Amino acid sequence: MARSLKKNPFVANHLLEKIEKLNMRAKKEIIVTWSRASTIIPTMIGHTIAIHNGKEHLPIFITDRMVGHKLGEFAPTLNFREHARNDNKSRR
């Protein structure tokens, strides 16, 4: 479901504070976060945010086309390997 337009997009407070500090200092550092539910806002453009996928942090460079999406959309949590092989020779 989409979030109501009356409400502002959700961005974790600690993440917003880190981005504002870096924007004031005009620095570009990697920001580590576990907040996959945060929405990407225009102030994040140009920053690299390391998003947790359950095992490690994946660094993602934020571009203008990502605005409005959630951070978790860019860090997949499941890596499908392949189905088990159907080995008919060993069954005979």
Swiss-Prot record:
List this protein's GO terms for biological process. Answer: ribosomal small subunit assembly; translation
Keyword rRNA processing annotated: no
What keywords are assigned to this protein? Answer: Chloroplast, Plastid, Ribonucleoprotein, Ribosomal protein, RNA-binding, rRNA-binding
Main location, first listed in the record: plastid
- What Gene3D superfamilies does UniProt report for this protein, alphabetically? 30s Ribosomal Protein S19, Chain A
Write out the annotated subcellular location.
Answer: Plastid, Chloroplast
Q: Name one GO molecular function term.
A: structural constituent of ribosome
Q: What positions belong to coiled-coil segments?
A: none
Q: Which domain of life is it from?
A: Eukaryota
Q: Which InterPro entries match?
A: Ribosomal_uS19, Ribosomal_uS19_bac-type, Ribosomal_uS19_CS, Ribosomal_uS19_SF
Q: GO cellular component annotations, sorted alphabetically?
A: chloroplast; mitochondrial small ribosomal subunit
Q: Function of this protein?
A: Protein S19 forms a complex with S13 that binds strongly to the 16S ribosomal RNA.
NCBIfam families of this UniProt entry?
Answer: rpsS_bact
User: What family is reported?
Assistant: Belongs to the universal ribosomal protein uS19 family.
- Name of this protein: Small ribosomal subunit protein uS19c
Source organism (scientific name): Buxus microphylla (Littleleaf boxwood)
